[in-house]
């Protein structure tokens, strides 16, 4: 038998141990006799329903059973009827047996039952300890505790034995081993009740003890006890429900036997059998009553309290099991008294609990026989279930839709039209499982054939090959009424799994489009035909590609062999059908641009080999003929691009039909080229006197050629010459031919790109490259001219082409071993850069009022605004791309950056990314650009309001706010950005003192107010750099300036204070010392030099650490070209000469301030050397005072061990919105929960050690930039 550890149960003394062993043996003998006696009485009283009397036998003894009588056989535990040994020879407990799961569960339970028969107290003690250990408790219930203590006292004692260091317990531990343990745990309880259902559960001891214990544990405040006991109780209840169901079945069978026997005639009636049947029915009823009492105890004592437990897992267990009870024993449990708990829990705040509710209800609604019992529940909670189709948890929404589908399947009257409409629109959901579930609902509601045979007969009478005609029309009507015509692909994808037969019925769709309606059929409108064509093309795409449309799913998944075969079969089927049908469809709808554009998408999904293998070349000729007619009829871009793409697909080299298609294509281009050439000559001859027909002929021919030139190499026709002539004429006669100029620009652009492709792929001669260079140069000049003349449409087109060509023909062209193409590299001159920037300022950063006025009265006002914004964003992005790749000077970005706040909603993401990339290129130049943008805003404000600015005005506050946002972009690592920030302060100081006040030296310089803006960056300076910048500031100050205290001098006072104060508040302790709390705590304990030594380090190195690390901290080089892109950086032309000649200049433009990274890196050093060489006693005494203050503050920090909390993100301003302004590539640092000031003081000097800096940089989880 399985016992608990008797060594734990026994007393510590030898005498008491002997006595306890004797008493245990006696107790075991007595309890065995008592149990056997009770079982005999129970059998005589109730019998064993469902089993013949001969089945009442004791379990057969095993060899291990005999070992129980041997002395010393009691150990830590027993399993399978004999002591189990682990690897070290120690027996294992019941918990360990179940956890290992190596033994058959029924054998484990049978052994426990036998031990119960021998000593029920010991066996129950094993079971109690099993539940305790399954809860993760290390304690053990002793036999004296079990006999002498109440359950509440035992649970309180076990609570004290919990391991408080870990919150995990078996049911919550991760991994497959513990997942299997949960299954074994549930199986053990189920098998235990099943094996005890004929005897032990009726002894009024075992079940009472277990239920009482589980009830107490389920009410514990310890989550592990509550969770484990609730799971055990619910599984126990489920097993009892199964027993009750069996008893009910036996009762019914016994009653039928009794009625049959009683209805016999008296001569054949067996009175003894009647008496036995009556006795059996009575015993069954008594057993049923006992089981019901047990179930009521569990339900009222545990379920009613735990279904609303604070822990979602516990609530989910309760709901899951009550669903099992209602399905298993619907006569007893499927009523409103139990359903209400599921209905109430539909409103649970946790998705997993709501999901269990829906799963439970699905199992009930699947059985249509149960619908009458669910009618009241459906009426009461239907609205809630329908609303859950919009649940924020997608898994819940999917199951809610499936439940609604089951309700519809069981009773169509249960759902109103409004309920159905709430589900219909979900077929357009971006989440595919939701959409597919809604598609299944839609299929059952609208597209299921109620009487297939009758519909097939009707179709034959009407001469149709498919009975799906009405369903296809219904699908079209649904699509049109949903008013989401751009989402046909989503609708098809949603219905694909449930309505494939309908969606693949391309013969039916073609019949509806081509053939005339039969008598009694309703004629399809033009709008319905367009919708049907769109849906048909979407079904073809879905069948050929076998993956969801863009926006649904995470990407293309690998198809299974079966799916791949289905895909190939579908592709063959659609190709065979549409090779014949497509020319007919194009012929009928050749005048309808929308239908033709959709129909021409079909050939890309063909298996083109079938043209030759199936000998269908005549159908190919028909298709090419129809495409040519379409090209001649239409000038819409969508139609022409579809024709061009179709030719490109059919011309593929891997198919034998290539030559036939290329001949047709060349003939078409020859004809279009001749028309274009003649039309251009006529137009240029007439010039300003050209009529509309001549202009239209040129525009139509050019538009067709442009669309074809996009996908085909047409350079042998040399369209660039005529296009260039049109462009020159358009510039001379401004406004005459706007559309022609736009198309000519685009066609010329394509021609240049195709010429470049030829040169890069071959071995070009110098003459070929010179010719292309000449072509590009002339085209760039024309585009530049278009920027200053012509209409807005032409300007925008010219600007985009200029940006693209400057990017393509930049230094990136020579990378990858293509140095021979250096002749083709173009660098924009200052004039072109200026014009591009002016265009951005005039056409991108425009006032909203102007835009609103220009669109006032438009019916599609909102759509036009969105389209206009999208166009402006593209213009800005194109120009910013030139800045990022160093094609346009970085200073041009100042005009972009200054609009960051004003246009944050429209362009904030683009400007932020540009700033991030420019900082990666050159930190120092980026900082100079930022301060330049602020200077520009300041100058604009001075020009508007004069030099006497109102410091409290909204305009000044706006500039300060922009400066604060810029400061946040430097991130938290002040070591990496120190030179850039110092350079920014230098430029700002020079700007503030650039112009002296003409009224005299007693008046502030004209730009002095700018220092208030500059003070926003002071928090980004290191402590020693603040002193350096302060010293540089003092160079510009006179004694008179330092004494002034009037309001006009407040910006200077404020800026000086920001440099002088706050030295002990900088964030060195959180910059580079570790990016997380764990790393910080390690650094604070390991490798830390003695405190007195660290003081010396700080005093000696705090003033010259910037000198010793000049070779360690370097400005990043040019921006590395990102992978998977065709753009490459050209070398920075502004390289640093080894020696800079001396030159005379004003103080604000000294040689050491030239734009040179190396010289900029040395600026702090030069300033510090000047400070060290100064012999001004006042300054030296001031520094001594500062040093003394630091010593005093450090002494206070060492003596004060009070924990502090610091939020590094809030240290500059303390405003929560600052968090959102950090760039995505800015390091986020997590501080430890607390650190006393002593630790922070001890940590600081590490950051002035070059070795520590290297260590810290390598320790970051991600780079700063």
From Swiss-Prot:
Bias (Basic residues) occurs at 1083-1095
Q: What Pfam families does the entry give?
A: HEAT_SCC3-SA, SCD, STAG
| Superkingdom, natural source | Eukaryota
* Disordered: region residues: 1-21, 37-91, 1063-1097, 1111-1130
User: What SUPFAM superfamilies does this protein's entry cite?
Assistant: ARM repeat (SSF48371)
Output the Gene Ontology terms for molecular function. chromatin binding; protein heterodimerization activity
Alphabetically sorted, this entry's keywords are: Cell cycle, Cell division, Centromere, Chromosome, Chromosome partition, Mitosis, Nucleus, Phosphoprotein
Q: Where is the composition biased (Basic and acidic residues)?
A: 62-73
Q: What is this protein called?
A: Cohesin subunit SA-1
Organism per entry = Xenopus laevis (African clawed frog)
Name the encoding gene, please.
stag1
